[in-house]
């Protein structure tokens, strides 16, 4: 959350990756920034080296409440989906630099974090994870899996509850081969340039919503992301949930995979849109998200996804509330982890986690 306790011309906070935590798979890279002169761009630096610009302009009502007198504070978020597995195993640092429209800049506090990695560049086969022969144990907010099979390699995994994700994240990997995961592989397109919507052979207008994933179950804080290209340029990306406009998505994230499919479309290499989204803010049950891309000449491209939400009784489990598994029991089967009698914020639940390719991790898919 934001606090209005500074008079600096440019303000910036990097919220994920979380300082002193362990990250793996596909997660969020996010924060917020403000400038009295408006924010021009956000740079992300990894291990002291410039990595990329992050799309800016996401909805942040909390920042707006903390800084009501600064124009644009309610659209001050920056966010993108990021494959932490594109980094080597071990310790890393990240910082964000905000530049305002007058040329001033401000660095965020550097975040020190670690990366744990699985066994391949990218696990694209949803059945490559097999827990049939795994042994499980539970302790406080952790799930230990011994002898899990990942692409036929025996691996021991440790998962831990993370407040930022509102779910369990892999924080330790033992066994197998540790050389894995490049972001460009994760984002390889399942479409060809021939599938683009075209008014003429020289005109392209295309939008693809990648998460939430069609017909899947989502819970906790995840990504809402995709890409859009147009020969005449993209003006904005609107997000509709269950037919109602909710916000614009920050646009302009690096997508070399899209550029490879649309090399002749200007801006295709920076065609991603993404934001961190708390799916628990929605009611349990079925929902539809639609992304509407508006071109600079008034054209429109749409892409939608129908999905389901499962959730605890609260929309957000704060860090002061307890996730306690010490008296729970656990069984594993295929790609699923089933936990019985878990205590979450004082209430008792049965919870099912399932392996998800998009996240490269286990997501909560059932809560009873």
Q: What is each model feature region?
A:
Residues 1-368:
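Long, low-complexity serine/threonine/glycine- and acidic-rich segments characteristic of extracellular
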């Amino acid at each position: 959350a934001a606090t209005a306790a500074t008079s600096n011309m440019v303000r910036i906070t990097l919220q994920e990756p979380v300082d002193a935590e362990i990250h793996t798979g596909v997660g969020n890279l996010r924060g917020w920034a403000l400038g009295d002169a408006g924010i021009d761009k956000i740079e992300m630096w990894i291990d002291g080296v410039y990595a990329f610009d992050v799309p800016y302009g996401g909805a942040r009502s909390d920042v707006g409440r903390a800084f009501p007198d600064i124009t644009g504070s309610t659209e001050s978020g920056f966010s993108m989906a990021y494959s932490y597995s594109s980094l080597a195993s071990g310790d890393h640092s990240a910082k964000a630099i905000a530049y305002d429209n007058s040329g001033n800049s401000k660095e965020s506090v550097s975040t020190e974090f670690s990366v744990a990695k699985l066994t391949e560049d990218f696990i694209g086969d949803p059945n490559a994870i097999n827990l049939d022969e795994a042994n499980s144990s539970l302790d406080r907010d952790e799930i230990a899996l011994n002898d899990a099979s990942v692409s036929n390699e025996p691996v021991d995994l440790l998962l831990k509850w993370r407040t930022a994700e509102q779910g369990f994240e892999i924080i330790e990997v033992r066994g197998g081969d540790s050389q894995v995961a490049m972001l460009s592989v994760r984002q390889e397109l399942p479409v060809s340039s021939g599938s683009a919507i075209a008014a003429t052979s020289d005109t392209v207008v295309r939008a693809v919503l990648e998460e939430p994933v069609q017909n899947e179950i989502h819970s906790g804080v995840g990504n809402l992301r995709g890409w859009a290209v147009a020969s005449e340029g993209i003006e904005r990306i609107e997000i509709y949930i269950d037919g109602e406009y909710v916000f614009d998505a920050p646009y302009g994230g690096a997508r070399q995979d899209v550029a490879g499919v649309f090399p002749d479309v200007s801006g295709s290499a920076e065609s991603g849109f993404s934001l961190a989204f708390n799916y628990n803010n929605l009611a349990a049950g079925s929902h539809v998200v639609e992304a509407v891309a508006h071109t600079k000449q008034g054209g429109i491209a749409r892409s939608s996804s129908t999905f389901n939400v499962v959730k605890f009784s609260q929309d957000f489990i704060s860090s002061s509330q307890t996730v306690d598994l010490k008296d729970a029991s656990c069984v594993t089967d295929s790609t699923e982890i089933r936990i019985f009698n878990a205590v979450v914020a004082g209430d008792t639940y049965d919870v099912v986690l399932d392996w998800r390719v998009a996240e490269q991790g286990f997501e909560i898919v059932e809560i009873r």
